[in-house]
Amino acid sequence: MEILTESLTQSAAVIPPKAGTRVMIVEDEAVVAMHLRQELTKLGHVVAGIATAGEQALKMIEEVFPDVILMDIHIQGEMDGIETAGRIPRYLHIPVIFLTAYSEDTTLKRASDTRPYGYLIKPFLDRELHATIKMALERARADEAVRENEALLFRALCTTPIAEC
């Protein structure tokens, strides 16, 4: 277990960007984090970083700018994964997928208030992980297209002589 913990601590450092979908893992269980890293790499994703606590995750997000975040709900530190997700600046528009061993309604309701792009209840299959990431990225692209179209519409409306912008 010491080797896994040491390996996880070393991997908490920022990993330089590469081609592919950049996934950040927020998970405090070394075995789970290493399994996720292995599966994500096998699926062609790039693990941009691994954080074990909410405070560490928020700092790392600003450094690595991941395409998607896999966030365990129950992590070490002063804030859990739900609070951490709620503190990610909205302007970054980073999809968060919650990983949890908990499936009770109160936890899922609290998590849904942060508008996650998905949930995976542990244990989950690798194909479920891949499909959830794919759907989250597709939704993120659609959300970005909506934001761009809204901005274009706003500019068009503001250029009309009768508009008050």
List PLM regions with ranges.
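Two-component/phosphorelay signaling modules centered on CheY-like receiver
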Residues: 21-22, 29-49
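Conserved sequence signature across two-component system core domains
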Residues: 26-27, 51, 69
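Active-site beta3 strand of CheY-like receiver
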Residues: 64-71, 75
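Alpha4 helix (beta4-alpha4-beta5 surface) of REC/receiver domains from two-component response regulators
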Residues: 79-83, 90, 97, 103-121
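PAS/LOV and related PAS-like sensory modules
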Residues: 2-19, 34-35, 110-113, 146-165
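Helix N-cap/capping motif at the beta->alpha junctions
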Residues: 50-59, 80-81
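Interdomain signal-transducing alpha-helical coiled-coil linkers
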Residues: 129, 135-150
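C-terminal output helix
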Residues: 106, 120, 124-133
